[in-house]
Amino acid sequence: MEGEQDIGVEFLGDYKILCYLRKGLWCQDILAEHRFIKKRYILKLLCSELSSSEAFMTAFHEAIIKLATIRHPGIISIENVSQAEGQYFLVTEEKEVPTLSLAQYLSSCSQGLSELEAKDLICQLAEILDYAHANRLIHGGLSLDSVHIDLTGQSPKVFLPELGFSFLLKDQYTQSLLRDSSEKSSFDKLKQILLFQAPETALGTVAEDVYAFGVIVYFLLFRQLPQGAFPLPSEAFPEYVYDWDRLIQSCLSYAVEKRPKKLAPLLVKKTLGEQFLAAKIQCSEEDLREIEEEPQVPSVANILQKVEDKIIEETSDHLEFVLVEAKSIDEAMNTSVDSKEEVVAEDESYSNALQSLLIREPVVSRYVEEEKEEVKPQPLFTEMVFIEGGKFLRGSREGQRDEHPVHEIFLHSFFLDIHPVTNEQFVRYLECSGSEQDKYYNELIRLKDSRIQRRSGKLVIEPGYAKHPVVGVTWYGASGYASWVGKRLPTEAEWEIASCGGVTQLRYPCGEEIDKSQANFFSSDTTPVMSYPANPYGLYDMAGNVYEWCEDWYGYDFYEISAQESHAPQGPAQGVYRVLRGGCWKSLKDDLRCAHRHRNNPGAVNSTYGFRCAKGVK
């Protein structure tokens, strides 16, 4: 990567620092590798000046919670948030943020952008902002410098690296520019901030993003910012087919309530009438002429009459042959001798009938394609076990701190799948959805970390793995599958009580001890479901094979809260991580305990993560 600075061996928490990357306004980017799982990430180390501000950290924490729950190719993807030696840092995927701002990209395009090129960038930006606003995220600092362009693919892709943080950093950014006020570039940037700022007081609202979006659209079309009584695109570019006037006027409206809530629907073409008028305006008066005489359009009957005359003329030499061939087979087999008058009369009547057939106007009916009902894949259901509700003990005295204290809870009755969802079950869900992402662009499964592959556009399971539990699936994929089959994910409390099999404070699902004949752990791969004995409830693979996603957000101290509010606990109201339970095929024995808690980001992908479904009793 460009700009990397080699350094010696150095650690930041659990991450081995490989090299330093670019330094931004609010963070230092670092390429690092996790010391245990040996996977590379980009760490964003917060500046000490910001991390020491309590007001900033409070707002920053709220933004992180929102960002951690979403996945979009145009928004920074956060895997984790951590702290080491008093330093806060974000853990993001190994993808360096593009360093080419929109201003730099436009300056590199000597010929300017065509309408379609500008429309493509505008459409991407509108779609990202609509997605962010739907998830209660505001940019608050849109400008030519905050919008980045990724040129690594076949076509330019819009990326917003500061989405969620920009509004928090606006004051600091302005102060840094004022410190460098002697430079002309700093003055230009300050001017740009003011021109992209909505006229109302800055509060970090959707309306402010919409206003800045309108300014960006105007700049992409005109290569200048809208100031004063600015001209509209229809005046300068009458040949453009999209209705840019409506978009710009609605976005730049001084009345906040008149600005649109969604941006993507504004990208519409002009009507055919508007396009015709625009084309007419372009034409000079010399090119316009009035049609004084009404053109003589031949009627359909005249055309058919001419065609008929031509056919009769061309076939007159062969008419006798045609008439003989066209007669019925009964007449051809008739060997009786008729009088000459009868033959002539019959031939004349037959000729007249043929001519009337030729001059008949053809009837053309509209072709309507027969609708074929698309047959979508149906789910393969798993047998379920009924678990009667009541009072139970959960937690552990010997485990980690987040398993304390042991406390009593009450659960309603519920059903639980007897084994985790398999590859052959999950592949039907993917075929039905038609994508590896949901409608919010959340990843459902990462195929390269699973045993399901896409070959020639078709999903196939690796040979021998149809009955193995599906892996590489995110929490979103697990939750989506459960909804598809009319079920849900189990709560953490339901999962723990089910793993104990109705026995109070059972250490492992199979008893007080466990060995490799009772569960798949500390091994090299998954095994087919139901390969090991079931627990007392008749549930298989509650220990080992794959970690299983639960419905709950993870809370480190939630057991203390659950001890006070013990009625059907369902986890914290919000959080950064989702709960995982049960250990996996490469876990140590301690991870297989019924009370052991694990967690990860809901969008995290791992070859050890799977799930099973639950259902309430109505």
Curated annotation (Swiss-Prot):
InterPro entries for this protein: CTDL_fold, Kinase-like_dom_sf, Prot_kinase_dom, Sulfatase_Mod_Factor_Kinase, SUMF_dom, SUMF_sf
Q: Where, in this chain's numbering, is ATP bound?
A: 21-29, 44
Enumerate the GO terms in the molecular function aspect.
ATP binding; formylglycine-generating oxidase activity; protein serine kinase activity; protein serine/threonine kinase activity
Q: Which UniProt keywords apply?
A: ATP-binding, Kinase, Nucleotide-binding, Phosphoprotein, Serine/threonine-protein kinase, Transferase
Q: Which residues form the Protein kinase domain?
A: 15-381
Superkingdom, natural source: Bacteria
Q: Which reaction does it catalyse?
A: L-seryl-[protein] + ATP = O-phospho-L-seryl-[protein] + ADP + H(+); L-threonyl-[protein] + ATP = O-phospho-L-threonyl-[protein] + ADP + H(+)
> What Pfam family is a match, any one?
Pkinase
Regarding how it is modified after translation, the entry says: Autophosphorylated on serine and threonine residues.
Q: Does the keyword Nucleotide-binding apply?
A: yes
What are the EC numbers? 2.7.11.1
Function as written in the Swiss-Prot or TrEMBL entry: Together with the serine/threonine kinase PknD, may play a role in the specific interactions with host proteins during intracellular growth.
Q: Which family does it belong to?
A: Belongs to the protein kinase superfamily. Ser/Thr protein kinase family.
Matching entries from PANTHER family are given as: FORMYLGLYCINE-GENERATING ENZYME, SULFATASE MODIFYING FACTOR 1, 2
What is the name listed in the Swiss-Prot or TrEMBL entry for this protein? Serine/threonine-protein kinase pkn1
Q: What is the lineage of its organism?
A: Bacteria, Pseudomonadati, Chlamydiota, Chlamydiia, Chlamydiales
**Recorded name of the encoding gene:** pkn1
